[in-house]
């Protein structure tokens, strides 16, 4: 894939970057070099390679998926000016 000058201008416009006509050829070369590198990556054989999320193998800490109230409802509403049954009371806004 190759990027032409019109594509460079379009990318600059979409990114809201001011690019002068003198800068277009340089940016065109830079973008083409980046795309060439990405094309090289597609040639790498990754069959049998497990996807990685970290460089060190580790397990996520898991907790039981149970519904609870957090057991701190009194603390949550402690600073509220007005509450009822662990709910915040607010003035009615919509009729």
Swiss-Prot record:
Q: What is its EC number?
A: 6.3.5.-
Q: InterPro entries annotated for this entry?
A: Asp/Glu-ADT_sf_sub_c, GatC
Q: Which domain of life is it from?
A: Bacteria
| Single GO biological process annotation from the record | glutaminyl-tRNAGln biosynthesis via transamidation
Alphabetical list of Gene3D superfamilies matching this protein: Glu-tRNAGln amidotransferase C subunit, N-terminal domain
Q: Which Pfam families match?
A: GatC (PF02686)
This enzyme catalyses: L-glutamyl-tRNA(Gln) + L-glutamine + ATP + H2O = L-glutaminyl-tRNA(Gln) + L-glutamate + ADP + phosphate + H(+); L-aspartyl-tRNA(Asn) + L-glutamine + ATP + H2O = L-asparaginyl-tRNA(Asn) + L-glutamate + ADP + phosphate + 2 H(+)
Class of this enzyme: ligase
Instruction: Tell me the GO molecular function terms.
Output: asparaginyl-tRNA synthase (glutamine-hydrolyzing) activity; ATP binding; glutaminyl-tRNA synthase (glutamine-hydrolyzing) activity
- UniProt entry keywords in alphabetical sequence: ATP-binding, Ligase, Nucleotide-binding, Protein biosynthesis
Q: What does this protein do?
A: Allows the formation of correctly charged Asn-tRNA(Asn) or Gln-tRNA(Gln) through the transamidation of misacylated Asp-tRNA(Asn) or Glu-tRNA(Gln) in organisms which lack either or both of asparaginyl-tRNA or glutaminyl-tRNA synthetases. The reaction takes place in the presence of glutamine and ATP through an activated phospho-Asp-tRNA(Asn) or phospho-Glu-tRNA(Gln).
**What does the annotation say about its assembly with partners?**
Heterotrimer of A, B and C subunits.
Q: Which family does it belong to?
A: Belongs to the GatC family.
**Protein name as annotated:** Aspartyl/glutamyl-tRNA(Asn/Gln) amidotransferase subunit C
The species is: Rhodopseudomonas palustris (strain TIE-1)
Q: Which gene encodes it?
A: gatC
């Amino acid at each position: 894939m190759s990027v032409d000058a019109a594509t460079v201008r379009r990318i600059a416009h979409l990114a809201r970057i001011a690019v002068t006509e003198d800068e277009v050829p340089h940016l065109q070369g830079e973008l083409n070099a980046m795309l060439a590198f990405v094309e090289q990556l597609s040639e790498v054989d990754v069959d049998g390679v497990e996807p990685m999320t970290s460089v060190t193998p580790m397990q996520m800490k898991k907790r039981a998926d149970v519904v609870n109230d957090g057991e701190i409802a009194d603390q949550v509403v402690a600073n509220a000016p007005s509450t009822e049954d662990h709910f915040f009371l607010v003035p009615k806004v919509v009729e």
